[in-house]
């Protein structure tokens, strides 16, 4: 495996055990430069409690979580009883939706896998502002600002979270240490499995706020963790986006970096 941090600058970004300090690995920037992308990748190794990033400043900058918020939204839905269990089916009302893959009945796992916005908007409406606010505080999730509308605050309004905070939240979920039942955390973790390779398992979620403009770009995310043997790697990637054709880069850039670190296949 290549060295985890070839060029190192250390900065304290958080008081948590996983990301109390983070090192800057500028060698990863070549993957961003090759695609003319402004973005950040944070990668943390659980056993050594070590984290690295290509961009220290951006790693702690907060952005709209977009559909990565489906992770806490699902847990909160289960905790409040809005989602009865992992077998609940969310019925399609037959009305046209923005994406054809949303136009069907969906399980919780299915709704997460296809990132069905209408399903999670309904969950948020049923949870309500008071309970939503309570759980975001319990989870220490981003800036915890849900103003602007209960069914859109994570899509276009004031909620913000950094890449560092994303990996902190994901570690707590992995360890079943969120202020939620172990059973409900396990349900959501299972729903997040996106790749099961012979040597590793990936749990992840994408997010996309829209393309924006060159002067005011949107944000695209990929966050999750990789289980490989006895090791766990937590990751969070975000990038500016002003052209939807660049959307696949939210996964291809971090995949190349993790492949270069010997974590997953390229």
UniProtKB/Swiss-Prot annotation:
Residues 1-20 form the signal peptide. The active site is at 67 (acyl-ester intermediate). Gene3D superfamilies: DD-peptidase/beta-lactamase superfamily. Its EC number is 3.5.2.6. GO terms for molecular function: beta-lactamase activity; penicillin binding. This is Beta-lactamase OXA-19. It is an enzyme of class 3 (hydrolase).
């Amino acid at each position: 495996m290549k060295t985890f941090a070839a060029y190192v600058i250390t900065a304290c970004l958080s008081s948590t055990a996983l990301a109390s300090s983070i090192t800057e690995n500028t060698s990863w920037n070549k993957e961003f430069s090759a695609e003319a992308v402004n973005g950040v990748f944070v990668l943390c190794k659980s056993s050594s409690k070590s984290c690295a990033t290509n961009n220290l400043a951006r790693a702690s900058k907060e952005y709209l979580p977009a559909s990565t918020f489906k992770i806490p939204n699902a847990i909160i839905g289960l905790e409040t009883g809005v989602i009865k269990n992992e077998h609940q089916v969310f019925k399609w009302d037959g009305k046209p939706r923005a994406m054809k893959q949303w136009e069907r009945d969906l399980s919780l796992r299915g709704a997460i896998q296809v990132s069905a916005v209408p399903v999670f908007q309904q969950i948020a409406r049923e949870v309500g502002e008071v309970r939503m606010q309570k759980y975001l505080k319990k989870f220490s999730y981003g800036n915890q600002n849900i103003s602007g509308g209960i069914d859109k605050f994570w899509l276009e309004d004031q909620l913000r979270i950094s890449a560092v905070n994303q990996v902190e939240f994901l570690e707590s979920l992995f360890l079943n240490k969120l202020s939620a039942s172990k059973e409900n955390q396990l349900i959501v973790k299972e729903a997040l499995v996106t790749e099961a390779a012979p040597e590793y398992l990936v749990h992840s979620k994408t997010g996309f706020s829209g393309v924006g403009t060159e002067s005011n770009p949107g944000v695209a995310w990929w966050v999750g963790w990789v289980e490989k043997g006895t090791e766990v790697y937590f990751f969070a990637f975000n990038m500016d986006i002003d052209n939807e054709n660049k959307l696949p880069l939210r996964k291809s850039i971090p995949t190349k970096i993790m492949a270069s670190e010997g974590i997953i296949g390229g």
